[in-house]
UniProtKB/Swiss-Prot annotation:
Predominant localisation class: cytoplasm
Enzyme Commission (EC) number: 5.4.3.8
Lineage: Bacteria, Pseudomonadati, Pseudomonadota, Betaproteobacteria, Burkholderiales
Modified residues annotated as N6-(pyridoxal phosphate)lysine in this record: 265
Keyword Isomerase appears in the UniProt entry: yes
Enzyme class per UniProt: isomerase
Origin species: Bordetella petrii (strain ATCC BAA-461 / DSM 12804 / CCUG 43448)
Names of the cofactor(s): pyridoxal 5'-phosphate
Pfam families named among the record's database cross-references: Aminotran_3
PANTHER family according to UniProt: GLUTAMATE-1-SEMIALDEHYDE 2,1-AMINOMUTASE (PTHR43713), GLUTAMATE-1-SEMIALDEHYDE 2,1-AMINOMUTASE 1, CHLOROPLASTIC-RELATED (PTHR43713:SF3)
Record-given protein name: Glutamate-1-semialdehyde 2,1-aminomutase
Amino acid sequence: MSSNAQLFDRACRSIPGGVNSPVRAFRSVGGTPRFIKRAQGPYVWDEEDTRYIDYVGSWGPAILGHAHPDVVQAVREAALDGLSFGAPTRAEVELAEVLIERLPSLEQVRLVSSGTEATMTAIRLARGATGRAKIIKFEGCYHGHSDSLLVKAGSGLLTFGNPSSAGVPPEFVSHTLTLEYNNLAAVQAAFAQHGADIACVIVEPVAGNMNLIKPAAGFLQGLRDVCTQHGAVLIFDEVMTGFRVGPQGVQGLAGIKPDLTTLAKVIGGGMPVGALGGRADLMAHLAPLGGVYQAGTLSGNPVAVAAGLATLRLIAQPGFYEQLAAQTQRLTDGLRQRARAAGIPFAADAIGGMFGLYFQDSVPTSFAEVSAGDADAFKRFFHAMLDRGVHFAPSAFEAGFVSATHDNAVIDATLDAAEAVFAAMKG
């Protein structure tokens, strides 16, 4: 049996950094990544046969828990009929119809294979439909790794984009304005200066890539209003929050209709599926109807779509989201109580089946605030919990996820471990 360390050494010889997505490398927390060989319900097992309670959940898709038998059966049955056709299928039509039925803002849907593809296409579509070049995104919001969205904010109220990744020429992001999340005044100022040139605003309506940051009161409605006023496209990136925080995502909770929505994660049930959808007049600009090109060999893959359909059927059961939110709240309430009892500066927040943990006195509202958290305390907490069989995301800037299989016994086992960890941290 290979150890995690042996596998990581081996991986580093054939894969850059030993991983196929950077956060998996444990660089921000140190130590050796756990190589997972199987998962079931709320648990994952590594190559050393150590079991962990899992709050990563494949970074969000595993809302039903890992390897739900109905989803696995749907994948098995679809695979028996063929893995990929490169042609239209009944199942992809059914998935599009389900998404349109569930989300009132969707009139038409285009399936892709990832969240990055969905957001990249949504930006291109907004630019093509409006004939404008500039886009607004927010500091700390992640929308995949396409060039125009790999931007961080600089100083000043209105900041023209600077690359935040090597290999992205400055001119590629020169039309990207990066503003502070939850700062509506900055958005209004940007439109006052550049309104005729702004194609769209793209936002995580609840940010999940700078830990969990909720929108301030009036922020999302303000974005809706300013986009409507200036004829810009409002894009809700619900890749993470779609069907994770409620049956209609954040847009349903907030009562706001974006013009375009991007989806992934839950809608694939653990398989690679993404989607963008929205107003029919905008979607009509996509090829083959319009001049905005988008294509994909595996878009609408029948096996992945089968997993998505099975998942969406199961999460539509009455009471599903109420129970999911209750379990998530049980976790965050319990962690807060135990940290307080130990005298550890700690805050937690939750929405639906998502949560954020912060080693600071209050819940942050921006990237700057979340960055002020105690990074060393998080590292100590992460490794101590991992040693006690609890698997959180290996970064202080990632949200966590609860599944339908995280019952009271699982949550309470997590809290027992946390109580011991907080006590040790204080001591």
